Amino acid sequence: MNVYEAMATQRAVRRLRPDPIPVPVIERIFQAAAWAPTGGNVQPFRMVAVTDRDKLATLGALYSKQWDSYTSGMRAEGEQLAIPRRKMMEAGDYLCQHFHTLPLVVVFCFNANHMAITDADLDRPSVVGGGSVYTAVQNLMLAARAEGVGCVLTTLLCFEESAVKDLLEIPDPWGTCAHIPMGYPVLGGYGPTSRRPVSKMLYQNTWQTPADFG
């Protein structure tokens, strides 16, 4: 599978089987994450691979609490909820119910002290630091796609960071920024993604000027 096919079919896969992922596959996926570019090549991230059943159950309980809060508005819409959002919610419910059976959850950690955060003083939320972590997250997810392993990027456990850090013995000043459930898909899992056309996302030279490379 080439990288373009992997990117074009990288759906969020929340319905995951408990079957173990072979060690060579896991090693290739984590190697891909470690290859990611980071600011100054400092690599200010670490990954905690969670496989312990008790820890997975605890993470699942924490995640389910936040998922219920996140989806409360959608549930209130009942039959009026749009079908794509209903499907997403149902898949998320499945993930919550089976979190303790997952073969692997990857917790991405970062150390802001090792980042050159060039937008820290701007009058808006800072995002530059994430550029030295989420590149690794995307590499990991693309590698998982290439290996046929399902996964989904989640961040709700950031609301439970203190409990997660205690559970996994993550020291200060490290924080968490992504939690990736992984496993082989229950159903087809991957397939063509649905996104805005690039013509709606790309400008040339000035804002809202349509790009024309002809």
Task: Enumerate the language-model features and the residues they cover.
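Small-aliphatic-rich amphipathic alpha-helix that forms the alpha element of a beta-alpha
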Residues: R28-I29, A33, V106-F108, A112-L167
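Short connector loops at helix/strand junctions that flank enzyme active sites
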Residues: V42-P44, F99-P103, G175
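C-terminal helix-cap and adjacent tail motif
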Residues: E5-A6, V13, C177-G214
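Glycine/small-residue-rich phosphate/adenosyl-binding loop
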Residues: A49-V133
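Short catalytic-loop micro-motif centered on adjacent basic/acidic residues
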Residues: R15-L16, R46, G150-T154
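Glycine-rich phosphate/pyrophosphate-binding beta-alpha loops
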Residues: A34-N41
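A short N-terminal beta-strand-loop micro-motif at the entrance of redox/enzyme domains
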Residues: V13-R28
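A glycine-rich helix N-cap at a beta->alpha junction
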Residues: D68-G78, L167-P192
